[in-house]
């Protein structure tokens, strides 16, 4: 079968990391590109399970989903090990994507001219190089802070070493380019802390080594958030483009499901009075921390909206739901973007995952951070010490007293007003960045010109 590539028609292979919140923002970007470049074919390659969810609603005709094997053998029984599904996928991903790209070319009869991939798929750099085509990775999972640290992993390891790491968490590192200082204990997992030989840690290390080879590196952020780090990253990459926040460039429709009535309930609350509690789809507080949050909310009489999995409700103090039925609302899921945009929300108690950070900046809501893993610690460091738009819960875990102190500080203390003012300032910068003449909009147009061949 003849495979062609005409000068007017391009073919971009989009390789997704099919876990957590990675695929959604990537597809959102591709949707924007597809609308602006109708002659370009975008072949979106992810697992069948991921694609089934992503493509349940109509997409532009020039975006086509294709499957890649998830690496789970037939009849496999999961042992519930950490990152078990990710590790299975990573073992077969390189070969799987290579075969999928070959199949896509046969079906479309159009040779792939670009590889746009989640940066977690570092091996896609080699795939693009073998084909002699451009590689455009996108850092979906974090901001410039975590990207910079992974870029300088070797420098950090050589400078800090590995001895006695467990007792050095509070040591301040002042040699990482772009950071005035950073607490050692807030480095992302896989740099110095955690199992450095795990497939996930190895993947993160290889990302930092591969990214300088990219034609263009994209990031789900906006330039004005991290000007110093952006200078460093610009000096390391041929082209570095902030094209977010994706929650503002591709906002969710207002008709998003609110089956549990969160928004009508919020409408009955006082302005900036409610604590919204949510830890994303992966992070999960321990039972004693669920108890601590509940006791702090009740003791402080803080109105609350809590997105809490049904499996965790069993850990709530006996009688808590009945005693606080007028004070708060617990739901298994909440439309977070809409919730954070509501005027009654005064604080967001969060794990500080990157999407949650961007969404709360867009809502102008200060944070109380409780990091769990991955980039949560470094995001929390930035929230408290650099951007000054929130606080880390004392000791990094929830106790009744630490949670009450954090709530009082953000909702009642003078510092809370400063946090609110600062995040309001960042909100305005983010909105300006995605405006018609904003930095993220200009960067998107730059990317569009590169892909369509008008700015090679």
Swiss-Prot record:
Q: In which tissues is it expressed?
A: Expressed at low levels in stems and leaves. Expressed in ovaries.
Q: What is its EC number?
A: 2.4.1.294
**What keywords does the record list, in alphabetical order?**
Flavonoid biosynthesis, Glycosyltransferase, Transferase
Q: Does the keyword Transferase feature in the UniProt annotation?
A: yes
Catalysed reactions, as listed in the record = cyanidin + UDP-alpha-D-galactose = cyanidin 3-O-beta-D-galactoside + UDP + H(+)
Q: Which SUPFAM superfamilies match?
A: UDP-Glycosyltransferase/glycogen phosphorylase
Q: Which residues bind UDP?
A: 281, 333-334, 351, 355-356, 359
The annotated active site, in chain numbering, is 22, 118
Cited CDD domains: GT1_Gtf-like
Instruction: List the Gene Ontology MF annotations in alphabetical order.
Output: cyanidin 3-O-galactosyltransferase activity; quercetin 3-O-glucosyltransferase activity; quercetin 7-O-glucosyltransferase activity
Give the protein family.
Answer: Belongs to the UDP-glycosyltransferase family.
Under which name does UniProt file this protein? Anthocyanidin 3-O-galactosyltransferase F3GT1
């Amino acid at each position: 079968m003849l495979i062609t590539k005409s000068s007017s028609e391009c073919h971009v292979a989009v390789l997704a990391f099919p876990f957590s919140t990675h695929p959604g923002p990537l597809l959102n970007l591709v949707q924007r590109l597809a609308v602006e470049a109708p002659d370009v074919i975008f072949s979106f390659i992810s697992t069948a399970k991921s694609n089934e969810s992503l493509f349940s609603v109509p997409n532009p005709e020039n975006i086509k989903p294709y499957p890649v094997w998830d690496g789970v053998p037939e009849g496999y029984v999961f042992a519930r090990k950490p990152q078990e599904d990710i590790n299975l996928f990573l073992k077969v991903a390189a070969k799987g994507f290579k075969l999928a790209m070959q199949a896509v070319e046969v079906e479309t009869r159009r040779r792939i001219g670009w590889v746009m991939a989640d940066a977690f798929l570092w091996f896609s750099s080699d795939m693009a190089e073998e084909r002699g085509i451009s590689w455009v990775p996108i850092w979906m999972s974090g901001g410039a802070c975590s990207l910079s640290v992974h870029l300088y992993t070797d420098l950090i390891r050589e400078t800090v070493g590995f001895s006695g790491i467990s007792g050095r968490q509070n040591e301040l590192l002042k040699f990482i380019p772009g950071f005035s200082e950073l607490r050692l204990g807030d480095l992302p997992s896989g740099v110095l802390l955690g199992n450095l030989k795990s497939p996930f840690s190895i993947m993160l290390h290889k990302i930092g080594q591969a990214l300088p080879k990219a034609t263009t590196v994209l990031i789900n952020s906006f330039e004005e958030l991290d000007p110093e780090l952006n200078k460093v990253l610009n000096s390391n990459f041929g082209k570095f483009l902030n094209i977010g926040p994706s929650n503002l460039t591709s906002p969710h429709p207002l008709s998003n499901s609110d089956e549990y009535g969160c928004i009508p309930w919020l409408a009955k609350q006082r302005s900036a009075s409610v604590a919204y509690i949510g830890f994303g789809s992966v992070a999960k507080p321990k039972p004693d921390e669920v108890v601590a949050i509940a006791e702090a909310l009740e003791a402080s009489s803080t109105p609350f909206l809590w997105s809490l999995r049904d499996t965790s409700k069993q850990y709530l103090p006996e009688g808590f739901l009945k005693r606080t039925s007028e004070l708060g609302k617990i739901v298994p899921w909440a439309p977070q973007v809409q919730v954070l945009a509501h005027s009654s929300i005064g604080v967001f108690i969060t794990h500080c995952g990157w999407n949650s950070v961007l969404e709360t900046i867009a809502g102008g809501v200060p944070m109380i951070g409780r990091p769990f893993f991955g980039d949560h610690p470094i995001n929390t460091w930035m929230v408290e010490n650099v951007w000054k738009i929130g606080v880390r819960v004392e000791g990094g875990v929830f106790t009744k007293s630490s949670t009450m102190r954090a709530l009082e500080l953000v909702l009642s203390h003078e510092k809370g007003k400063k946090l609110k003012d600062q995040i309001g300032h960042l909100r305005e910068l983010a909105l300006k960045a995605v405006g018609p003449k904003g930095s993220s909009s200009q960067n998107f147009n730059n990317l569009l010109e590169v892909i369509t061949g008008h700015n090679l």
